[in-house]
Amino acid sequence: MSQGMLTILSAENHNHASSMLANTLIDLISQNNGETTIGLAGGSTPSLAYSILGQETDLLANVIFWLTDERWVHHDDDLSNSKMIKSSFDKNDISLLYPDFSGDNATLDAEKYTERVLSSFTEFTCAVLGVGEDGHTASLFPGSNALDEKGVKFVSTNVEAHPRIRLTATFELLAQIKNVYLLVTGNNKKDIVEEIVKGETNLPVNHLINIRTETHLLTDQL
């Protein structure tokens, strides 16, 4: 498979990378005529960028946020990405689409979330993604059943992390997003950043880069 274009934005440290990402999103929203849709990753890495972005209250009025992946828990659970994201935006009343938690059928919950997202908008402006030390992005982990899913936008998957059951966007969905930003910071991510830049291994993050025309990497490890 041919390698997609990787645009690297080097930062001095995590705070600098977070500020760069937030300002990039602010510029994108400002330049976008009409509604903007932004996919958000969970975890602690992007929380500062979200907090900076959350200060732009008026600008966010025309933004619909959605989740690139979610732990299969209630959206108010302390483990949920939804709760972390809302907290990061410092009580700014953002429009965030999150999946319902049935508690008994993750596959059906993923299907319903697909319907919720696609009925709300049809154009995916951009998304923020993290990358794990094992090369996973969203909840597309190495060896996961979700890696080979075709014809669907979100699926449920079992992963080697807690909680095990996740809902995740598929490669098919992530490939059609106009702008994808990988935020990868910290000394523990140095090795995986090198793997991303080399592009020689078929880790989930490298596969994503290869199926896209262009992907942006913001990191303090280069």
Regions found by a protein language model. Give the residues of each.
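N-terminal glycine-/serine-/threonine-rich phosphate-binding loop
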Residues: 1-38
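A glycine- and small-aliphatic-rich helix-loop capping segment at beta-alpha/alpha-beta transitions
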Residues: 52-60, 86, 142-150
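Ligand-binding beta-strand-loop-alpha-helix segment within the catalytic cores
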Residues: 2-5, 60-128
